[in-house]
């Protein structure tokens, strides 16, 4: 059990501040001064978490961030299932981004859906010297011949494309005209842009604006009959089928989901989104830009929602219903009431097994704050959290709505810092990504992988909460953790293996 369970708030705050100072001591003075701005202990009543964010990582540290290409291709565009996404540049970026994140979809792979396939222009040295536009044209022609049912193509630029100045926009316009108006989207997401994958999200949002929305032509005959209850799910990547479990609740309360993207999304759904009455935004960090644009240009309001855990689900359903009439408000209450027996059963089964357990998180997007409510519904306490690529508004939301007094906050934490924090705080569970998973498991710390749900899920919605509770119980209470200490060390004082 964590030390947090036996200490007062003041003692925990003092311990965490001391821990930050201890971690910073190993750095050179200049580095320590820079990193100190990213580490803090939350104080109740403050409007933010007191850390600097969205700043370039220090060269030489083991940062856990990605690049702009990862943010565009790997997060925003990649899950659009009926479009082919070209990793334009050397093969490495495509190879190492292939299959690294689950995005479930409905379709026949290689025929009308292409999410799990990897397309690359395989740049060589001669392409750097003489330019890659001719190779890109050849790749586009091959895709058009081999995959004729694709509904569009995106060109995801890797670093060399921006460095040598290839005109991918001109190629896109030319080939689109040649293919009879096919949607071809050039995305300037070279990895050297920005400080993390976050700029890649923004660039991808801008590409949707400039190459999808701005090219929509006024319709003669509408493609579908609009209703007052049309909504679009934005920023759910359907990692474990989460968009589907969320969609069930929205439709049960009387709304019609006309688009969901990017997870299990299509080009047609992108094009239909400007006709929604409300955009409901799951991942604020990666999709708030396009949501704000649609509010400004099309007058579509948007709201952020959280379907992790029953408390936040009920809160979000009522928040969404507030944009509609009494029919939808009554529908929201009906849905909450319908699933209450399931919630009660899950909590009755798992809360006694998880009550008082402590958690430290370090993930991307919205999860450093959104999953806190689900843990608290199970009686667990989040004692530390941080964002890989968060901005100041993420930390404001975290401080104002999620974390408790004395919570340890760490932005762009590196491998050294995170390991030292876990050693000293001794949480019962650490939730982070695949790069951290095996480090902490070898330290004897239960670890659910919180980027892809450890190939479980969904975790969204009421059904997802049952799976989430089961997985957290399996992680924390697995008998294997009793076997991590050598028998001849059993008599020693219990502590983390890494501290030995």
From Swiss-Prot:
GO process terms (BP): nitrogen fixation
Binding, [8Fe-7S] cluster? 67, 93, 159
How does this polypeptide assemble, per the annotation?
Tetramer of two alpha and two beta chains. Forms complex with the iron protein (nitrogenase component 2).
| Cross-referenced Pfam families | Oxidored_nitro
Keywords of this protein's UniProt record, alphabetized? ATP-binding, Iron, Iron-sulfur, Metal-binding, Molybdenum, Nitrogen fixation, Nucleotide-binding, Oxidoreductase
Report residues binding [7Fe-Mo-9S-C-homocitryl] cluster. Answer: 283, 451
The superkingdom listed in its UniProt entry is Bacteria
Q: What is its EC number?
A: 1.18.6.1
Query: Per its database record, what is this protein's job?
Result: This molybdenum-iron protein is part of the nitrogenase complex that catalyzes the key enzymatic reactions in nitrogen fixation.
The terms describing its cellular component in GO are:
molybdenum-iron nitrogenase complex
Q: Which organism is it from?
A: Bradyrhizobium sp. (strain ANU 289)
Q: What reaction gets catalysed by this protein?
A: N2 + 8 reduced [2Fe-2S]-[ferredoxin] + 16 ATP + 16 H2O = H2 + 8 oxidized [2Fe-2S]-[ferredoxin] + 2 NH4(+) + 16 ADP + 16 phosphate + 6 H(+)
Q: Which InterPro entries is this protein grouped with?
A: Nase/OxRdtase_comp1, Nase_comp1_asu, Nase_comp1_CS, Nase_Mo-Fe_asu
Question: Gene that codes for this?
Answer: nifD
One function term, GO molecular function aspect: nitrogenase activity
Which family, according to UniProt? Belongs to the NifD/NifK/NifE/NifN family.
What is the free-text note on the cofactor? Answer: Binds 1 [8Fe-7S] cluster per heterodimer. Binds 1 [7Fe-Mo-9S-C-homocitryl] cluster per subunit.
What is this protein identified as?
Answer: Nitrogenase molybdenum-iron protein alpha chain
Query: Which cofactor is essential here?
Result: [8Fe-7S] cluster; [7Fe-Mo-9S-C-homocitryl] cluster
């Amino acid at each position: 059990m964590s030390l947090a369970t036996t200490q007062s708030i003041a003692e925990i705050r003092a311990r965490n501040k001391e821990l930050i100072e201890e971690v910073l001591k190993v750095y050179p003075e200049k580095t320590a001064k820079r990193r100190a701005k990213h580490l803090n202990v939350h104080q109740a009543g403050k409007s933010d978490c007191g850390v600097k964010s969205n700043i370039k990582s220090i060269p030489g540290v083991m940062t856990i961030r990605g690049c702009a290409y990862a943010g565009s291709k790997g997060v925003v565009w990649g899950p659009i299932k009926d479009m082919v996404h070209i990793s334009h540049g050397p093969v490495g970026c495509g190879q190492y981004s292939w299959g690294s994140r689950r995005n479930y979809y409905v379709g026949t792979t290689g025929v009308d859906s292409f999410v799990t396939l990897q397309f690359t222009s395989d740049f060589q040295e001669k392409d750097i010297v003489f330019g890659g536009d001719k190779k890109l044209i050849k790749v586009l022609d091959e895709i058009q011949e081999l995959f004729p049912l694709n509904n569009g193509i995106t060109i995801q630029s890797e670093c060399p494309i921006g460095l040598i100045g290839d005109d991918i926009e001109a190629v896109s316009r030319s080939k689109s005209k040649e293919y009879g108006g096919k949607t071809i989207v050039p995305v300037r997401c070279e990895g050297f842009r920005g400080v993390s994958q976050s700029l890649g999200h923004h660039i991808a949002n801008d590409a949707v604006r400039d190459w999808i929305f701005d090219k929509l032509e006024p319709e003669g005959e509408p493609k579908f009959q609009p209703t007052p209850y049309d909504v679009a799910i934005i920023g759910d990547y359907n990692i474990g089928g989460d968009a589907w479990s969320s969609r069930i609740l929205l439709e049960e309360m009387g709304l019609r989901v006309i688009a969901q993207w990017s997870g299990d999304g299509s080009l047609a759904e992108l094009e239909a989104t400007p006709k929604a009455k409300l955009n409901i935004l799951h991942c604020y960090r990666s999709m708030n830009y396009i949501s704000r644009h649609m509010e400004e240009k099309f007058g579509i309001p948007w709201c952020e929602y959280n379907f992790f855990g029953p408390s936040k689900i009920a809160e979000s359903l009522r928040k969404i219903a507030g944009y509609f009439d009494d029919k939808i408000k009554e529908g929201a209450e009906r849905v909450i009431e319908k699933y209450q027996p399931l919630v009660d059963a899950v909590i009755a089964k798992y809360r006694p097994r998880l009550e008082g357990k402590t958690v430290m998180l370090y993930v991307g997007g919205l999860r450093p704050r959104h999953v806190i409510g689900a843990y608290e519904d199970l009686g667990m306490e989040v004692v530390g959290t941080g964002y890989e690529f968060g901005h100041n508004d993420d930390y404001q939301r975290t401080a104002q709505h999620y974390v408790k007094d004395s919570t340890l906050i760490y932005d762009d934490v590196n491998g050294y810092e995170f390991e030292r924090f876990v050693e000293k705080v001794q949480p019962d569970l650490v939730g982070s990504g695949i790069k951290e998973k095996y480090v902490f498991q070898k330290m004897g710390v239960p670890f659910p992988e919180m980027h892809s749900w450890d190939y479980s899920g969904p975790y969204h919605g009421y059904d997802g909460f049952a799976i989430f509770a089961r997985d957290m119980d399996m992680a924390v209470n697995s008998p294997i953790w009793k076997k991590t200490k050598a028998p001849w060390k059993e008599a020693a004082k219990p502590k983390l293996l890494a501290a030995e």
